[in-house]
């Protein structure tokens, strides 16, 4: 086993794929490793323990084979059963020629097969690219091409959407894609179930990339976030410890498990790491979720703020017994103090705020934190080795307690997006800090309060929408000359999207329905379709001639409150 497989490369540099004598790819081409001295520090402090996810699953299955690992509807899978399922899928994939270093786009909802495939890929040393269930052609084709995926794993039909049709388009548009594997009725594709071949011993290097997470993004299409075994195993283990997960933990995954929060913060992997049970569902409405929580005696779950508020309201009339619940994590978007209070009033002192990101850094309010901290802050960094800087626009530290831009680096925060040299040059400082794009303030106790953001991203109740991506897509509409997408405040989701559109001379700008149909047709995920469309004769510009997003955000706010675009803000009317 090669313990230290990374060479030292600066942020933004490409590291070459390294091939061992046996032909395994050790470091994915296009990933930026941690510098040697930091890697050594993270190992010395016991954060990085040289674990791989394949060895972890085997160790769990050996330690308690008969305990329940996963529950889905009426199905219960023991740890031994999960390991056997992963082995079966690994044999299947090996039979198709999927091998160490290959990337596989995994787009499955919250079903046990997600984890069977995830761990099968770990077995093979192949790398899952975790697409969200709501991603559509635009995102999927991009993810397949960017990762040069050889396979794409989908359900047959999920929530009325036929993934086999999307897969057929992906096969046409992503040249490297060789296999589509379907859970359920395969249609023209390959069933995930089926015969396979022996699995060759895979690579066993903890500093290899274990998975690629998809970023919420701020520019154009989503980016890929390489997470190594060392860093993600630490992410999971430290989160499980902080959240006091143990063998009696019953974690309900109601958010998509392809998202970092429900996967590893501590999520399903945290529950498994602790020897507990994970219950999978994608029905987060309170009727279904509460019934499941009562049935399974769920002790912990994670929600985005809008769902947390809906659940809090539902406790007024719901009769389910939720007394087993000890931890209710809320994160992904800002939870206002008054909403935090509502959640706390409804569920008792089980609320935990989580401020995290797929890129790494996680902040949790501690389970025994004073109520004031839980209501008013978004938590404290998970690791003693998380380095935090709060800076102004020139990267100068702001005085303590002042709001500024959050920069971070640490043992589980990426050093570069996958194959994104140009973006990496600005997304990181020269000394490797990730520019989160979030505006925060640090309290004297070291807790962070998220005050806003500098990045152009709309946070639609936890679903991240990159303004640039929607703008790019809308610009393809034949009647659209120019466009700018901004957030509008929304009581439930926190924010919704508003697209300002300037029509081409003589053309009529598309209305909301037409724009929505157009964007869906182009394969954009449905949650990225603008909630509002407003027409302008021209976009306002700043002194240097850039689109004035500040003015547009203000205008969108006024319009949402009942004004008119032409009266209030169109500079040329
Ligand atoms: C989580 O991850 P992502 O990658 O979908 O989104 C990260 C961004 C952050 O940069 C921040 O802008 C926002 O989402 N965010 C919050 C927040 N938690 C995330 N903004 C305000 N308050 C919070 N509590 O969203 C994520 C990943 C792991 C755990 C939890 C959330």
Where is each model-derived feature located?
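Structural core segment of the AMP-binding/adenylate-forming
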Residues: 6-27, 95-96, 126-190, 505
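Conserved AMP-binding/adenylate-forming core of the ANL superfamily
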Residues: 47-50, 54, 58, 66-97, ...
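Conserved pre-ATP/AMP-binding loop-to-beta segment of ANL
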Residues: 50, 65-66, 196-216, 221, ...
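AMP-binding/adenylate-forming catalytic core of the ANL superfamily
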Residues: 91, 135-142, 152-154, 301, ...
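Conserved AMP-binding/adenylation subdomain of ANL enzymes
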Residues: 233-250, 260-300, 314
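Gly/Ser/Thr-rich phosphate-binding loop
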Residues: 298-302, 312-373, 387
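Conserved ATP/PPi-binding loop(s) of AMP-dependent carboxylate-activating enzymes
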Residues: 381-385, 396-427, 465
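AMP-binding/adenylate-forming catalytic domain of the ANL superfamily
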Residues: 524-546, 570-572
């Amino acid at each position: 086993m090669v313990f230290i497989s990374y060479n030292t490369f600066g942020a933004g540099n490409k590291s070459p794929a390294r091939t061992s004598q046996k032909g395994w790819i050790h470091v994915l081409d296009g990933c930026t490793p941690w510098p040697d001295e930091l890697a050594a520090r993270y190992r010395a402090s016991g954060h990085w323990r040289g674990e791989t996810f394949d060895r972890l699953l085997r160790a769990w299955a050996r330690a308690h084979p008969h305990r329940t690992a996963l529950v889905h509807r009426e199905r219960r899978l023991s740890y031994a059963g999960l390991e056997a399922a992963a082995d079966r899928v690994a044999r299947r994939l090996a039979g198709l020629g999927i091998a160490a270093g290959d990337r596989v786009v995994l787009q499955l909802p919250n079903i046990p097969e997600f984890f069977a495939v995830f761990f099968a890929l770990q077995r093979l040393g192949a790398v899952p690219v975790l697409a969200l269930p709501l991603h559509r052609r635009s995102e999927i084709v991009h993810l397949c091409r960017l990762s040069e995926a050889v396979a794409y794993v989908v359900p047959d039909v999920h929530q009325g959407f036929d993934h086999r049709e999307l897969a057929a388009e992906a096969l046409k548009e992503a040249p490297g894609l060789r296999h589509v594997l379907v859970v359920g009725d395969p249609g023209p594709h390959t069933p995930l179930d089926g015969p396979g071949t022996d699995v060759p011993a895979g690579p066993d290097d903890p500093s290899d990339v274990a998975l690629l997470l998809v970023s919420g993004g701020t520019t154009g299409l989503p980016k890929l976030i390489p997470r190594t075994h060392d860093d993600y195993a630490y992410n999971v283990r430290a989160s499980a410890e902080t959240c006091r997960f143990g063998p009696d933990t019953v974690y309900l995954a109601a958010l998509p498990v392809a998202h970092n929060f429900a996967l590893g913060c501590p999520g399903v992997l945290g529950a498994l790491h602790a020897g507990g049970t994970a219950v999978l569902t994608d029905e987060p409405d309170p009727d279904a979720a509460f019934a499941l929580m009562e049935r399974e005696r769920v002790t912990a779950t994670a929600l985005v703020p809008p769902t947390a508020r809906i659940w809090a309201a539902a406790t007024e009339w719901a009769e389910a017994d939720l007394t087993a619940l000890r931890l209710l994590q809320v994160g992904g978007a800002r939870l206002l103090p008054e909403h935090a209070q509502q959640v706390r009033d409804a569920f008792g002192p089980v609320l935990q705020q989580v401020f995290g990101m797929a890129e790494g850094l996680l902040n949790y309010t501690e389970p025994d934190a004073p109520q004031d901290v839980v209501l008013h802050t978004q938590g404290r960094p998970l690791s003693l080795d998380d380095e935090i800087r709060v800076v102004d626009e020139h990267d100068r530290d702001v005085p303590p307690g002042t709001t500024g831009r959050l920069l971070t680096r640490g043992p589980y925060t990426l050093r570069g997006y996958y194959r994104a040299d140009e973006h990496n040059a600005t997304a990181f400082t020269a000394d490797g800090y990730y520019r989160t794009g979030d505006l925060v303030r640090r309290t004297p106790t070291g807790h962070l309060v998220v005050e806003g953001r500098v990045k152009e991203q709309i946070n639609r109740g936890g679903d991240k929408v990159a303004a640039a991506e929607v703008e790019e897509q809308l610009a393809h509409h034949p009647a659209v000359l120019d466009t700018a997408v901004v957030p509008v405040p929304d009581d439930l989701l926190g924010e919704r999207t508003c697209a300002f559109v300037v029509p081409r001379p003589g053309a009529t700008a598309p209305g909301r329905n037409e724009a929505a149909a157009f964007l869906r047709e182009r394969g954009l995920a449905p949650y990225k379709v603008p909630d509002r469309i407003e027409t302008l004769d021209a976009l306002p510009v700043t002194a240097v001639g850039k689109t004035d997003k500040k003015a547009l955000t203000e205008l969108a706010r006024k319009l949402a409150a009942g004004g008119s675009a032409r009266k209030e803000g169109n500079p040329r009317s």
